[in-house]
């Protein structure tokens, strides 16, 4: 009897072990803020294909800002299409919008979304226009018997009330608070999904706020916008971001036991170690075979860093309209450096990809001081606050208190009360707060045209990399 009982117990234990949920693995591969940097796309393709060869359940996700930053993509016959064609070929599954998706206007974006073979989700864009169709707030993918929910959100903090960019690009669109919408759809989807993912283009600072406030329904947040490398756990939710410009791929491993998440891990993998996929390399090479963009327009006599490029652009907008002072916002300087030697048209269009025009204003030093202080203390677009944002041809010092709030701006070379002709980008003219001026207008002079003309006529250019602006704590 005792032997029979022991046998029954052994058999029962074996059956229980056999029936216990076995652990399976789901892999989320992620990119963000690629900014049209397709040079590395063949390496991305190799990395994705290697993962698909070894893992059964793989989902490929992008967190926005797919174009603006590479002339070979941005100035293609259909701007942005080379990037979309590559993403379609690689088999992306889901993506959300970034602020730069709107750079060519909402009608253009609406047409581009129709060309995307992957789901585009965004829970906080509401359209009242026929040019931009409503987007689904989320999608649920079924992979290997698992239901995986993806909610998308985009920043509305820099506008304010809409993503960073010219306000005209967002006419007829409203952008509800992305954190509120992320919470709303988390509550709706969590009971219906085995895994819940937020694909966020809010920036890691806003993602951290959301998770610290208790958005624990999400298993993973795939982030973007701030160009950071992020791998952290907040309240049980994994927050990730891969940097920018397709330098890395994010690999999130989700271990499933039955239909429950047993654990999540993240690795940031550099693409530099992968040999380019030859099929994708051929497609990318065709994009770069553009004689017009490849032609050297002039040359730099020395290497230029980001500050030097900003100095050049500030001087160029002033020269272009014969202004006494030029300002250029650092966010509009889209390259970090240009080496000494020949400078191609593609480099100039990569430096300034927006088709920016020059605006003219009459301002006193008091007006300029107000503009600089307001931007430094910006309570809305905090990502651009508490830094030197407006690079200028005239030196100045921002004086701050101990809490880093701007109190004053000193102009050692300007005369108080005098009215100066000032040149800025049309983006600053249309979007910056607290601009006080007279005789303001947007001219027909475009920034890239001025830069190209200077290269053609004045090469070799010596670029001044010395900062003219600084901050001093009082």
What residue ranges belong to the model's regions?
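Sec-dependent signal peptide recognition
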Residues: 2-10
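Intrinsically disordered, low-complexity peptide-like regions
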Residues: 4-5, 217, 275, 463
